[in-house]
Design a protein with these regions (language model features):
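Sec/Tat signal peptide C-region and signal peptidase I cleavage site
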Residues: 3-7
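Subset of outer-membrane beta-barrel
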Residues: 8-298
Length: 298
């Protein structure tokens, strides 16, 4: 018997459209003010040792405010993520920087990096395998490794394309015989359409994830937004689940979100569905009500 650390090595968030900075450092400083974003995800609820994930990011702009919309500006992000699954606990700490290069008509090309550390903890004291494995018997490990993420994005007021490369530093974990940290790529794209003369907008989005030696994972989203205050979305994760999400602005500077993943694969027999909640806090001043200004989903 051998262990591969985290068949799902990196968390995929159902509410990624609202929390891109958790994946891609090129989104650091995207908003014109400081923001805090947090997510808690309980995956496959009802299954023993099912994954649970928590993430927190603080992001903002560096330096003096841009003089105009054709000025280069810089962003920063500080991020912490914690994943727990059975005997494993995975902590990631990152500090990020992004540069945003403007073009005419409010087109931006951005590049960002995260530098940080991965901490993998393994404790099999509560693990009861069917067959004894000497490589993990009475094992407790704590492993620290450097981590690097690179991201880029291109956006206008109506669409965006973003690409992030994660687990850039390939390493072997000292847990079992086949425990490796593998390279991941994450691509997302979306657009925004105003629905007539109303205050509603419609934003389709796609997210594509690929890790070495694994099938491509696809998420499709359809998100409706009213006056930057109310968001409703439907999604589909290929061969895995249907997604339903809602997000509301409360008390001016807070946005609270919830998503539910209705599992379609073999886990459905155990009704092992997934719940995710999010909270974001923005220091931005209130803008004039109306359609959202960018499909990056601030």
């Amino acid at each position: 018997m051998s262990w591969t650390v985290f068949a799902q090595q990196l968390t995929h968030y159902s509410q990624q459209p609202f929390n891109q900075v958790l994946i891609n450092p090129a989104f650091a400083g995207n908003a014109a003010c400081a923001e805090m974003k947090s997510v808690h995800r309980a995956q496959w609820v009802g299954l023993e040792n099912a994954p649970k994930s928590t993430a927190l990011a603080i992001t903002g702009r560096l330096g003096k405010p841009a003089k105009d919309r054709l000025s280069v500006f810089h962003g920063f992000a500080l991020k912490f993520e914690n994943d727990r699954m059975g005997p494993f606990q995975h902590n990631r700490f990152h500090a990020g920087y992004a540069i945003h290069l403007p073009f005419k008509n409010e087109h931006f090309l951005s590049f960002g990096t995260y530098f940080g550390v991965d901490n993998i903890n393994f404790d099999n004291s509560n693990l009861h395998p069917l067959q004894s494995d000497p490589s993990i018997q009475n094992s407790r490990y704590s492993f620290l490794a450097p981590d690097f993420v690179f991201g880029t994005k291109y956006n206008t007021k109506k669409l965006f394309f973003a690409l992030a490369f994660q687990n850039f530093v390939p390493l072997d974990y000292p847990i079992g015989a086949q425990s490796k940290k593998v390279f991941h790529a994450n691509f997302s794209s979306g657009a925004q359409f105003e629905l007539g003369k109303s205050d509603w907008t419609f934003s389709p989005m796609i997210n594509v994830r690929k890790a070495l030696r694994t099938p491509i994972a696809l998420d499709f989203y359809s998100i409706f937004t009213y006056r930057q205050d109310i968001y409703f979305g439907l999604g589909f994760r290929n061969q895995e689940s249907l997604l339903i999400m809602a997000r509301f602005k409360v008390f001016g500077r807070f946005k609270v979100g919830y998503s539910f993943d209705w599992v379609l694969n073999s886990l459905r027999g155990g009704m092992a569905h997934t719940h995710e909640i999010s909270l974001s806090i923005s220091a931005c001043k209130e803008r004039k009500k109306g359609a959202t200004i960018c499909p990056v989903f601030e």
